[in-house]
Amino acid sequence: KTFPGQVALQDATFDVEEGEVHALVGQNGSGKSTLIKVLAGFHQPDPGHNVTMNDEVFDIGSVEAAHAAGIRFVHQDLGLVEAVSTVENLALGFGYDTSFGRRINWAAETKRAKQALLDLGFDIDVRVPVAFLGGAARTGVAIARALQESDRNISILILDEPTANLPGADVDRLFDAVRRLK
């Protein structure tokens, strides 16, 4: 990936097998964030460069294209609406169940949110505002939302500095959740 006057990524390749967890480590300015942003569709790769997954070539030039390829991204700032509940935050990612016609089926929404968080190891009251959750649980909500944004299987889940603002106990809890994803 080239920006005006600067090469940010050159001949970057890496392989990820199903169930693996990887961390990008490197000096400031080494291209970690640029690689993540290219994979997530926030930056277009230079012409002639693309992403290959499972022998399928993807032209990742937008967030929509990254989603179509099964790539999900959780920002460092999480993008949660702290004043509303976990149920509502998750529904922002995958839409509301309106099986009651035009009315939202809150019982179904609550059940779906509860299960999504339990799958990650977070047994929390999904009806309370996100502002009252701890750091690891908030990150868990963001991960659950990313995982449920579509019916397509997720190929890659990218977490941008997920432990940056977490105390030690929350880091351990988050790593437990990531291990459950394997």
Question: Whereabouts are the PLM-identified features?
Answer:
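Glycine-rich phosphate-binding loops of nucleotide-dependent enzymes
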Residues: 1-182
